């Protein structure tokens, strides 16, 4: 595997010798001093260029970065069209180095620096940036919820539990799992993150997908949270679902108490609805 210096040398030497490339930046976790470095970190590189078409019309210039295992061009896909501006190349190389390279036109420079604060300037041929930004992850720090935000999280969680119940009672486990993972679990994790912020402060980030959450919660809570990922049968799905509801109730009640917010009354009503439906339809170990 090439070293970090070797990768930067290849990228910057190429950029310095190509007149179309006027500026180079680095984004993402490699700019964040709060993220422990490891071999899986991508090199998120952006080239600001004078002529986009001359690059995108032929991929041969990418060979300078090494032999690739796979290449993805999100902006060139029909099934998964990209929503971001520019044109990007997601490259995994045979030595396990991963480079996500994006091309942007020069006219987007000012707008670009408003998108994210985790940016480091690597090359500026024309001295366009008077004061290079200092990378910071402040935009990803935990956010103290307002009463309205707290209410919205509770409402989204408890409203969506009715969809999970519907899927389980209809024996549509994929429907139930989808709503459990995409919405119910998402709001549970959000609520847990708020409790962490209340106890630890709102001055740091839990990382993408809450990947550092384990460091900040009691072992008992963590084990209960992990148990909710067992969804391979209807009985297990019911157990995971009920554990999610119990965890959310406990955590959100504590958040409400700590922030002096009103806890929603519909928790009890929806919980009784879930009990009633489960009793009516029962459970069985059937994955069909």
Swiss-Prot record:
InterPro entries per UniProt: Aminoglycoside_adenylylTfrase (IPR007530), NT_sf (IPR043519)
Catalytic activity: streptomycin + ATP = 6-O-adenylylstreptomycin + diphosphate
Keywords: Antibiotic resistance, Nucleotidyltransferase, Plasmid, Transferase
Sample GO molecular function, one term: nucleotidyltransferase activity
Observed effect of gene inactivation: Loss of streptomycin resistance.
Keyword Transferase on entry: yes
GO biological process: response to antibiotic
EC number: 2.7.7.-
A Pfam family: Adenyl_transf
Note: In strain C179b a 10242 bp segment of DNA has been inserted into the chromosome between cj0168c and sodB. This piece of DNA forms a multidrug resistance genomic island and is transferable among C.jejuni strains.
NCBIfam families recorded: ANT_6
Protein name: Aminoglycoside 6-adenylyltransferase
Organism listed in the record: Campylobacter jejuni
Chain's gene name: aadK
